[in-house]
A protein has these predicted regions:
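Acidic-basic catalytic patches of nuclease active cores, encompassing PD-(D/E)XK
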Residues: 1-58
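Short, well-structured alpha-helical interface segments that form or flank functional binding sites
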Residues: 34, 38, 64-66, 91-99
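Active-site metal-binding core of divalent-cation-utilizing nuclease and nuclease-like domains
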Residues: 41-75, 88-91
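Conserved catalytic cores of phosphodiester-cleaving nucleases, focusing on short active-site segments
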Residues: 71-86, 100
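Hydrophobic beta-strand segments of well-ordered beta-sheets in folded domains
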Residues: 77-79, 107-119, 145
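Active-site-adjacent loop/helix micro-motif of nuclease/hydrolase catalytic cores
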Residues: 81-97, 123-127
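Short, charged, amphipathic alpha-helix that recurs within catalytic cores of restriction-modification
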Residues: 91-113
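Domain-level recognition of nuclease-like catalytic cores that cleave nucleotide substrates
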Residues: 115-167
């Protein structure tokens, strides 16, 4: 099984173990921000234990910047951004894609960017503007953008292959 597939499974399972995962807790270190940090920390601990040399955490995407990917798997040329607020109309969707394009431009072998969001992220990111950005990233930069939605009770993956590509 590819590392990314296994890692996505771990991310989904970790979310299902947190009873308040689907709730909107609000901003703040003791609320939503703290819950997100706890979730990311758990995922990172499992990844570090399972793949100490294959999965890079907080990977510097663009040299001489503070632009990092949450996770990067060099052998699969894939980055993962845990962007739980993707379901909000204003999120880091465009910024994360632009970061990936800058990383490619700087020479990072990157063919796939996976964005992890909470429930309703898939619906929001299937709106015309988001689809246009995804298609442009593929057509102009051969960068496949995927949005995966996780929820405590279930998981849904966006059926969104890049144009002309089938799994």
């Amino acid at each position: 099984m590819p590392i990314i597939d296994d890692l996505l499974h771990i991310i989904h399972n970790t979310a299902s173990e947190i009873p308040t995962f689907d709730q909107r807790l609000g901003p703040g270190a003791d609320k939503g921000n703290g819950a997100t940090k706890f979730f990311v920390k758990k995922v990172n601990e499992i990844a570090a234990e399972r793949w100490p040399n294959q999965v890079q955490q907080n990977f510097r995407a663009v040299p001489n910047t503070r632009m990092d990917f949450d996770l990067y798997v060099p052998s699969e040329c894939t980055a993962i951004e845990i962007a739980l607020s993707l379901r909000n109309s204003v999120s880091e969707y465009e910024k994360d894609i632009f970061k990936a394009l800058l990383a490619q431009s700087a020479g990072l072998p990157l063919k796939r960017l996976i964005l992890i969001g909470k429930n309703d992220s898939v619906r929001i990111r299937n709106m015309p503007a988001s689809v246009a950005i995804r298609n442009w990233a593929w057509e102009k930069h051969s960068l496949k953008i995927e949005v995966h939605e996780i929820a405590a009770a279930a998981s849904v993956t966006m059926a969104d292959d890049a144009p002309g590509e089938e799994d």
